[in-house]
Every structure is written in structure tokens, then in C-alpha cells.
Regions:
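Extracellular glycan-modifying ectodomains
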Residues: 1-434
Length: 434
């Protein structure tokens, strides 16, 4: 008798579980699909269009899988909860998560990608950032909140940093382009109170490792010192993991110095202020009263050179969507996603055509940190081809050949350069892995 009751209970439980799976599956198909992730600050995978060609030649099943997982009901809440849980138990540094950093310096084996010859060292006076008060903060889901500022702790993986430099070296050899690299530190390098220094990796050491691993023909744009020098200014957001437009400008100045170009004066730009801005780290901690009480202002420096910009899909095909590089406040008045005011967000591929006549065309390989930086390049190039390596899956060699690209620039932030999942994406984008 007991066995029959047990069997009936098991059957009822199985039926209930199956019904829940069917209901959730049905909801995930028929509910309205989101198109943007506020937590991750990115566009979500669009619904793929079926065709025989797509099925056999364009990885249609993979696109369906990505679309389904990206638009699953409650995904945003689940991602936020996962971030919080990871923060409670600590996360290793060979991965990247919004607001979750490593608490140790990983000593990994070297990568198999070829390492370049160390570059010659230059002697320069040491630059130090202003002294940071050694005040107490609060850990929230892997993010350290100090007063009204959220700090994303940094995980230093030597293995992945070396891998990043190897990818750049291989790219330059493959395409024969004059190649530059600009990797920026984050605010935790300059704003972390002394009592928490052991909880975050040394970003300057990581940047020096990149420099030492790059081939001698690679132009390494060293921006650590200028970011340290200006760290007392508003060069990083308090509620977001990105630099501000001003921070990106100072990096642009260093790029110009390294290339023999004259940077446009900061005061020559018209500005648009988007406020209030509460960014990725504010969302990662689930909201914080002190941060909310003193929100960021996102300042856009308006492009001065006449231009057109077209955004393209992941494979780089189609006619492109014409948009703007400098969005006005009224365009985003009712939007929380004000970071897209820089270069209209993170399209997989964008082509900017200016009215310059320099004969120079540049390919920029970046993630979201490059959005605030790229518009400054319009002063110096006829065309700027911008690839977000996280999303683009087209033929980058075809773009280089058909556009007549003359040089390339990698613009990345140190957390992305040291994250294996991001390096996987970069290699896939370059067609070096599946």
C-alpha cells in the first residue's frame, strides 16, 4: 500500500515538474522578447531568420540557442542573482563579470601563442595618483562601495594577459597593418582605499606585462600615467565601470602623441550632458542609496568634423542603419541606458566616414570602453571601421581589404584583456577558433 502511495506521489511530482517545464517553455516562446540587457549594457541576440542557407551555412541552430538563452523569461533577474551569489563565495580571476573581481593574483602557465620581444623601456619620472582616504567601504555582491562610489575589483590572470598580447601580435602579422594597442586601467587602480589593496590585482603590473609581451613593431599606447595624473578629475563614473568622456579624451591625447598627431583641445568641443546616470555597478549592487543620491552626469563631446555613421549586423552585411555619434539628451530623456549616448552604443560593426582627406583609414577593435573614445578619432581619419569583438562574426579580413584599411587600434579595458571568455570571443571574431 505504501509503495503504491509512493509511486503515485512520484508520478504526481513528475507530472507537476513536466507541466512547469512546458509552461516555462511556452512562456519563453510567446512572451514579448526584450532587446536590451540593462544589467550587461548590451543588445540581446535577435530572433534569427530561417532559410536553407542559414540552416546549413550560417550556424542557424547556434543563433537560435543564443536568442533563446538571451531572451529567457526573468533572465535579467537570474543574471543579477548569479552575480550576487558569486560575490558571496568569491570568483576566480580568469573570468569577467560585471562587478565581480578576483581576490588573488593567479600564477598560470604561459599560453602557447607566441610572445613578442620585450619593448625598450623608457625612463620617465614616476607618476602617482592623489592620495585616497583609507575609509571603510561595504562589499555588495563582489563590488566594493565606498561612500557614493562603486569599485569593481580586478582579477589579474597572467596567463590571459599574455594571451591578449599574443592575439595582438598574431593579428599584426596576419594582416600586415600598423597596429596600436591602448589598454586602460579602471578606477579601482586609483580609488581603492589602502585597507582593501590586497583584494584587487595590480593593474599597472598587468599593463606592464602586456607591454613586455608585445612585438617591437606594435605601438603600445601607455595611458596608465595620464589616468593616474588626472584621477582627481572626473575621469571615471562613480556608478559605472566605464571611464567618462573626459577620461577617454585624455587617452585619445596619448594616442595622438604616439602617432605624431595633434589632439583637438578639449575646450573646442561642444558638450551634451545626460543626467541622472546610474550605471552598471549601481545595478550590480542592487541599488545603493548613497550612489543614487549623487548620480553621475554623462558628458558627450560632440563630433566637430562632418561625418556619416552606419551600424551593421553581426555579420557586417546589409546597407547599415544610419545613426549618430553624439546623442543629445532629449534622445535619451526617458531611457536608463544613457551610456549609448557615446557612439550610439555597441553595434557589432560600425563604419564612420568623415569629410577628411588624409588617406588614413583605421580599424578599431574594442568593447564598450571604446564607445567614448572612438568619436575623437574623427579628427584624423577618413574612415573609422569599428568592430565590437564580442558580437561581430563576419569576415574582418574582407573589411580590411575592401575598405583599404591602413592601420588598426585595439582599445580595451584591463578587465576585458585579462578575461579568458573575452579572449575566446576575440579569437572567434578573428576566425581563429569555433
Amino acid at each position: 500500500m505504501k509503495s503504491k502511495r509512493d509511486n503515485a506521489g512520484h508520478a504526481a511530482a513528475a507530472a507537476s515538474f513536466f507541466a512547469i517545464l512546458v509552461a516555462v517553455g511556452a512562456l519563453s516562446v510567446f512572451l514579448t522578447k526584450p532587446t536590451f540587457s540593462a544589467l550587461e549594457n548590451r543588445d540581446l541576440e535577435p530572433a534569427p531568420k530561417f532559410s536553407i542557407r542559414a540552416l546549413f551555412f550560417e550556424h542557424f541552430p547556434d543563433h537560435v540557442s543564443s536568442w533563446y538563452s538571451d531572451t529567457f523569461p526573468g533572465r535579467e533577474q537570474l543574471v543579477g542573482a548569479a552575480t550576487w551569489i558569486r560575490g558571496l563565495r568569491g570568483v576566480g580571476g580568469d573570468s569577467i563579470h560585471l562587478g565581480v573581481g578576483s581576490l588573488q593574483d593567479f600564477e598560470d602557465e604561459p599560453e602557447t601563442l607566441p610572445a613578442g620581444a620585450p619593448q625598450a623601456e623608457t625612463t620617465a619620472p614616476p607618476v602617482t595618483a592623489p592620495t585616497v582616504p583609507d575609509v571603510e567601504g561595504e562589499m555588495k555582491g563582489g563590488v566594493l562601495v565606498v561612500g557614493d562610489t562603486a569599485l569593481e575589483l580586478y582579477g589579474f590572470s597572467r596567463k590571459t594577459i599574455t594571451r591578449y598580447a599574443g592575439i595582438v601580435n598574431r593579428f599584426a602579422k596576419t594582416y600586415g597593418l600598423d597596429t596600436s594597442v591602448l589598454v586602460t586601467p579602471t578606477n579601482v587602480a586609483f580609488k581603492l582605499p589602502a585597507r582593501y589593496q590586497s583584494m584587487s590585482g595590480d593593474q599597472k603590473e598587468a599593463l606592464e606585462l602586456i607591454k613586455s609581451e608585445l612585438d617591437s613593431n606594435i605601438n603600445n599606447v601607455w595611458v596608465y600615467d595620464t589616468m593616474a595624473q588626472h584621477s582627481g578629475e572626473y575621469v571615471y563614473f562613480r556608478s559605472d565601470h566605464h571611464w567618462t568622456g573626459r577620461g577617454a579624451y585624455y587617452a585619445y591625447v596619448e594616442f595622438c602623441k604616439s602617432k605624431g598627431l595633434t589632439a583637438a583641445p578639449l575646450e573646442s568641443y561642444e558638450t551634451y550632458d545626460h543626467t541622472p546616470f546610474l550605471g552598471s555597478l549601481y545595478r550590480a549592487v542592487g541599488g545603493d542609496a548613497k550612489i543614487k543620491a549623487n548620480p553621475d552626469t554623462l558628458t558627450v563631446y560632440r563630433v566637430k568634423v562632418p561625418y556619416t555613421i552606419f551600424q551593421y549586423s553581426k555579420d557586417g552585411g546589409g546597407n547599415g542603419l544610419q545613426t549618430e555619434l553624439s546623442l543629445k539628451p532629449e534622445a535619451l530623456a526617458n531611457s536608463e541606458e544613457k551610456y549609448v549616448a557615446y557612439a550610439s552604443g555597441d553595434p557589432p560593426y560600425a563604419k564612420i566616414v568623415t569629410e577628411n582627406n588624409t588617406g588614413r583609414k583605421i580599424l578599431v577593435i574594442r568593447e564598450s570602453f571604446g564607445a567614448a573614445f572612438t568619436p575623437f578619432l574623427t579628427e584624423h581619419f577618413d574612415e573609422i571601421h569599428v568592430i565590437d569583438f564580442r558580437y561581430f562574426n563576419g569576415d574582418i579580413g574582407k573589411i580590411i581589404r575592401e575598405a583599404g584599411v591602413t592601420e588598426a587600434l585595439f582599445v580595451n579595458y584591463i578587465t576585458a584583456a585579462g578575461a579568458s571568455v573575452q579572449m575566446d570571443r576575440m579569437e572567434r571574431m578573428l576566425g581563429w577558433s569555433n
